[in-house]
Amino acid sequence: MTSLAVLLTLADSRLPTGAHVHSGGIEEAIAAGMVTGLATLEAFLKRRVRTHGLLTASIAAAVHRGELAVDDADRETDARTPAPAARHASRSQGRGLIRLARRVWPDSGWEELGPRPHLAVVAGRVGALSGLAPEHNALHLVYITMTGSAIAAQRLLALDPAEVTVVTFQLSELCEQIAQEATAGLADLSDPLLDTLAQRHDERVRPLFVS
C-alpha cells in the first residue's frame, strides 16, 4: 500500500476504530447554544483544530519520529488534557485504533502501549509502521479532529451535508498549517472551554455521542 493510500485510509470516516461515536465536544456545544448553524460551527471547528488538533498531532509526530517514548508521550498527553472526560475519550479512541492496528501490523510490539493508550500515542506508532511522513500523519489527525465534529454537528443540527462539506473545504488550508506547526515540536497548550464541554457532556443523561 502506498503512503498516499495509507493516508486516505486513516482519514476515512468509515475506519472501524469507534471514532464515529465521539463528537469532540460539539454535542455539548450545541446543547449550550454555542453552535447553532454553519457560522458558529466553523468558529468551533477552527478553535478545535488550533488547540486539540495541534496538541494531538504534535504528540503523534514526536512518537512517529522516535523523539518521544511511549510512556513519556502518555504522560505528556495527560498533562495537556486536564479534564478526566477528555482523557477518557482520547484513550477510548486510542484503544479502537490499536485494536485495528494489531490486525494490520501484527507482531509490532503493541503490548508496549498498554491496554488503553491515548489516540496520539497509537497514531504516532501507526504512522511510523505505515511509512507515512510525520507531517502527513499529523495532517490526518488534524483532519479527523475537524471532520469528526463537523459530521456530528451535521447530524445533530440537520444541516445540509453539502454546506458542511464546503466549510471543511474552507478549513483545509488551516488544517495544513496546523499540521506543519505540529511537526515543529510539542504543542504546550490546552483549551479550558473544550475541557469544560467534555466534562459537562460526561455528566449528561443519555447523550447521543460518547463524547
From Swiss-Prot:
GO terms for cellular component: cytoplasm. Pfam families: UreF (PF01730). Keywords: Chaperone, Cytoplasm, Nickel insertion. InterPro entries: UreF, UreF_sf. One of its GO terms (molecular function) is nickel cation binding. It is found in: Cytoplasm. The keyword Chaperone applies. Residues 71-93 are annotated as: Disordered. Required for maturation of urease via the functional incorporation of the urease nickel metallocenter. Belongs to the UreF family. UreD, UreF and UreG form a complex that acts as a GTP-hydrolysis-dependent molecular chaperone, activating the urease apoprotein by helping to assemble the nickel containing metallocenter of UreC. The UreE protein probably delivers the nickel. This is Urease accessory protein UreF. It comes from Mycobacterium tuberculosis (strain ATCC 25177 / H37Ra). The lineage of its organism: Bacteria, Bacillati, Actinomycetota, Actinomycetes, Mycobacteriales. The gene is ureF.
